[in-house]
A protein has these predicted regions:
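Long, compositionally biased, intrinsically disordered regions
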Residues: 12-141
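Glycine-centered recognition micro-motifs in short, flexible terminal segments and loops
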Residues: 1-10
Length: 141
């Protein structure tokens, strides 16, 4: 009876250690995914800033509805120095997916409507991010 009790206890101990280790790994994986999501959403403020930065360039190029912003890579070139590997992928996404929906010009202001859609699972772990960014920027004279 003591021997059976010992083996049952040993099996339960090994099982519980395996279970808690699996739970710990799942929590760490969830935290990694959360960090990646936070990183994408934190880019919204930066996108606002850089949208203003390219405002004049976009208007000067005469980009109309539905056209992609040409030369966005050069506008954000410094990203490569700050976050090398991540930046290259992000630049490619931005260059392909930031669209000028419309440009309205009147005597006293210019209105630039931007749309940015990111749909990617490039962060691994089967995570799919579907992120939309829409802004209407107004520059008054």
């Amino acid at each position: 009876a003591v021997l059976i009790f010992f083996f049952v206890s040993l099996i339960l101990l090994i099982g519980s250690l395996f279970y808690f280790n699996t739970q710990k790994n799942n929590v760490e994986k969830t935290l990694d995914i959360s960090d990646n999501i936070d990183r994408i959403y934190s880019k919204q403020t930066e996108l606002d800033y850089y949208s203003w930065k390219i405002f004049d360039k976009v208007v000067k190029q005469g980009i109309s509805k539905g056209e992609f912003v040409n030369g966005l890579r050069s506008e954000l070139e410094f990203y490569k120095d700050v976050e090398k590997g991540y930046a290259v992928r992000e630049l490619e996404f931005l260059e392909r997916q930031l669209v000028v929906e419309n440009v309205e010009v009147s005597d006293d202001k210019i209105v630039l409507k931007l749309n940015f859609n990111l749909y990617t699972d490039s962060f691994g772990e089967g995570l799919v991010i579907d992120y939309s960014y829409n802004r209407e920027l107004v520059k008054e004279f």
